[in-house]
């Protein structure tokens, strides 16, 4: 019922897409601005060895910005989900008095939320806020999926090799720790 809600909200609220687009554009511009400031400050700090360090620092900044941007998306996605749930839950809770079948859950909330979303459009301020937040969250989720689908091949593949090496190193370390602990325990026991 999430997908049906999202599709219904997106169809009902075309304005929300424009609003989120402008917000996303501003956020992206902010990232570019911070990146330009860092690049401008790095050569000032090290003017003489400028040829090599800027390249490494730029690569590091790009990876750092990508990771930070991805983490920000993930952090943003969690509250978005909570916002969606919070925005969806009030409408069935309000309709609990009218329809006692809401508690069972998935099918009924869908039937109830659909007219509930149609009703808010008539009321001016409070209820329009909920569909816009949900629809903007939906657009954000879609954009996050697109961005994550594009970025992971670059960001995720390098960490895999160190992660594997860390796991492989960690496994014998754990075994060694267990063995040493057990032997020490045996010594203490003896």
UniProtKB/Swiss-Prot annotation:
Disordered: region residues: 13-59, 86-110, 142-190
Presence of keyword Zinc-finger: yes
Highest taxon in the source lineage: Eukaryota
Subcellular location per the Swiss-Prot or TrEMBL entry: Nucleus
GO cellular component: nucleus
GO terms of molecular function: DNA binding; zinc ion binding
Its job: Gap class segmentation protein that controls development of head structures.
Full protein name: Protein hunchback
Native species: Scaptomyza crassifemur (Fruit fly)
């Amino acid at each position: 019922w999430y997908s049906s809600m999202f599709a219904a909200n997106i169809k009902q609220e075309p304005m929300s897409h424009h609003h989120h687009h402008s917000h996303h554009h501003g956020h992206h511009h902010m990232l570019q601005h911070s990146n330009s400031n860092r690049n401008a400050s790095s050569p000032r700090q090290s003017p003489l060895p400028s040829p090599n360090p800027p390249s490494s620092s730029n690569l590091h900044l790009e990876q750092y910005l990508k990771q930070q941007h991805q983490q920000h998306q993930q952090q943003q996605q969690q509250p978005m989900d909570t916002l969606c749930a919070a925005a969806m839950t009030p409408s069935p809770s309000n309709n609990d008095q009218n329809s006692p079948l809401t508690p069972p859950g998935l099918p009924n909330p869908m039937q109830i939320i659909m007219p509930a979303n149609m009703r808010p459009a008539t009321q001016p301020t409070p209820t329009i806020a909920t569909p816009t937040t949900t629809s903007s969250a939906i657009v954000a989720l879609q954009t996050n999926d697109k961005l994550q689908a594009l970025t992971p091949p670059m960001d995720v593949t390098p960490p895999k090799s160190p992660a594997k090496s860390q796991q492989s190193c960690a496994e014998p370390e754990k075994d060694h720790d267990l063995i040493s602990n057990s032997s020490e325990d045996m010594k203490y026991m003896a």
